[in-house]
Amino acid sequence: MSVTESRTPFNSSLRWNAIQRIARQQARDSLLGWSLYLAAAIAVLIAVILVYNSIRFVGESGLNIVLRPFFLPLQAALSLALLYITAEAALAIARPREQGALQVLFFAPIDIPVLVGGFFLAGLLVYVLFLLLIVPVLLILAWITNFVVPTGLLWGLVPTIFIAGVTIAFGLFISAAAPSARSTVLLLVAAILILLVIQGAYAALLSIPPTNRFYDALLFLRVFLGSIQGLLSWVSPFRMLDIVLAAALRGDWLNVLQLVGIAIIGTLFWLAASVWAMRQRGVLP
C-alpha cells in the first residue's frame, strides 16, 4: 500500500525544522539507550587487543618501531561504528512500520523526504557521538603505550563522516524496501557478509606465494576477485574507510577529496532510492 503524504505546503524552513526535530529525537533515544555505549565499549576493546598484540610483537621481535601502530586499531573501531549506524538505520523505518507506529508520524505535517532526511541526520549525529566516545579513549591508550598518533590520521576522521553518510543512506534504503524488520536484518547481514567474504578471499589469494603449485591454477579467480575488489573501492564503505585513512595518513588529500565526492554521490543515490522505496512500500505493516 502506498503512503499518503501530507498535503500541507512546505517551505525549506519548515522542512528543515521538521528534519531537525526528528533527528534530535532519534539521537536522544540513542544517547539515552545502552546499545551505543555497548558498541563503543566493544570498539575500544578491539582496539586495546590490537594495540596489545602490537606491543607483544615488538617485545618478541626486538623491533624498536612498528609501522602505522595505531592505524589498524582506529580502522577496526571505525568499522564497528559504521556497522552500528548501518544497523540502526536499517531498523529506523522497518521496526516502527512493523509495530504500526510509523503511520502515526504522518498525522503530523511531514512527508517522506522529511522523514528520511530526519533519520539520515540522526544517523550522522549518532556517528559523531560514537567518535566522541571512542577517540578520547584511544588517545589515552596511545599516551599510555607511547604510540604516536599522526595528526593526519586524526584529520582523516573528518571525511569518514561522509562515508558514514553512505552507510546510513544504504541502511535506510533496506529499511524502506524490506517487508519486515527481520528481513531487513537478514538483508543487511547478507550484504555485509558478501563484502567481507570477497575482500577476505582476495587477500587470501594474494598471500599465496608464486612457488605454490596452485598459484597458476587460481590466476583467473585472482584476477576476477581483483576486479571486484577494485569496484568495491568505489562502493564499499569499509574499503573506502581503509583508503581514506591511508590517504590521510600519507597526506594525499586529493585522493581523500575524490572519495568524499564519491561518497556524496552514493549518499544522494541511496537517499533518493529510500524515498522511492518508501513511497512504493508504504507505512503499513
Q: What name fits each language-model region?
A:
Residues A41-A43, T184-L195:
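Central hydrophobic cores of alpha-helical transmembrane segments
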Residues P69-R95:
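Long, hydrophobic alpha-helical segments
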Residues F57-E60, V197-V275:
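Terminal transmembrane helical anchor/hairpin motif
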Residues L91-L124, V128:
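Helix-loop-helix units of permease transmembrane domains in multi-pass membrane transporters
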Residues I46-Y52, L141, A191-A201:
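Aromatic-anchored segments of alpha-helical transmembrane domains
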Residues I49-S54, G59, L63-L78, L121-T184:
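Secretory targeting signals
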Residues M1-A41, M278-L284:
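Aromatic- and glycine-rich beta-strand/loop motifs that create alpha-glucan
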Residues L82-A89, V137, A169-F173, L186, ...:
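Hydrophobic/aromatic residues in alpha-helical transmembrane segments
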